């Protein structure tokens, strides 16, 4: 039996694994609030927790985010299993989004928050994690996929 949408599953697994591994490393290595300058004033590892969405949007105790992560994950798994064979960019994009959604979703269900640690200070950006990065990269992949597809014609012949 041939495995349908193989790149989707590989991307999802790698994204999920990298996200969980990096969060585990941060929790084991740093105290909450501790920061390590990698490039001082530009990029730091800073251990914070986030009860909001990606990039600290909707900060606060937001219960619906755990269910959103679960719903997105289930929809993407259903698409990969039951839907058509996707092109490579779609598989990569949806797989990265699934890996990120599962990584943050598991944190929300198990901990009630997400571990964030990527701190770009040069642009004064919110602290985020690898799952957020994978979701963002996945969206870019889907945009690239949509640009490569020919526009569908909605004109009826006369």
Swiss-Prot record:
Alphabetized UniProt keyword annotations: Aspartyl protease, Cell inner membrane, Cell membrane, Hydrolase, Membrane, Protease, Transmembrane, Transmembrane helix
Protein name: Lipoprotein signal peptidase
Record's keyword annotation contains Membrane: yes
Membrane topology annotation: Multi-pass membrane protein
GO molecular function, one term: aspartic-type endopeptidase activity
Domain of life: Bacteria
A Pfam family hit: Peptidase_A8
Entry's transmembrane regions: 7-27, 38-58, 67-87, 95-115, 125-145
Recorded family membership: Belongs to the peptidase A8 family.
Annotated catalysed reactions: Release of signal peptides from bacterial membrane prolipoproteins. Hydrolyzes -Xaa-Yaa-Zaa-|-(S,diacylglyceryl)Cys-, in which Xaa is hydrophobic (preferably Leu), and Yaa (Ala or Ser) and Zaa (Gly or Ala) have small, neutral side chains
Record: active site: 116, 132
Cell inner membrane among keywords: yes
GO biological process: proteolysis
Protein purpose: This protein specifically catalyzes the removal of signal peptides from prolipoproteins.
Pathway(s) where this gene product acts: Protein modification; lipoprotein biosynthesis (signal peptide cleavage)
UniProt GO cellular component terms: plasma membrane
Compartment(s) of residence: Cell inner membrane
Protein encoded by which gene: lspA
NCBIfam families: lspA (TIGR00077)
Documented EC number(s): 3.4.23.36
């Amino acid at each position: 039996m041939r495995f349908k949408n193989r790149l989707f599953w590989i991307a999802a697994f790698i994204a999920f694994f990298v996200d969980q591994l990096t969060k585990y490393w941060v929790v084991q290595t740093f105290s909450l609030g501790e920061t390590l300058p990698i490039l001082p004033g530009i990029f730091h590892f800073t251990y914070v927790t986030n009860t909001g969405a990606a990039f600290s949007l909707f900060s606060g105790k937001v219960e619906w985010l755990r269910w959103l992560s679960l719903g997105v994950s289930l929809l993407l798994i259903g698409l990969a299993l039951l839907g058509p064979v996707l092109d490579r960019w779609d598989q990569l994009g949806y797989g990265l989004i699934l890996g990120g959604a599962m990584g943050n979703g598991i944190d929300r269900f198990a901990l009630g928050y997400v571990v964030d640690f990527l701190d770009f200070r040069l642009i004064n950006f919110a602290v985020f994690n690898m799952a957020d990065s994978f979701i963002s990269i996945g969206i870019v992949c889907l945009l690239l996929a949509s640009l490569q597809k020919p526009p569908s014609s909605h004109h009826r012949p006369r």
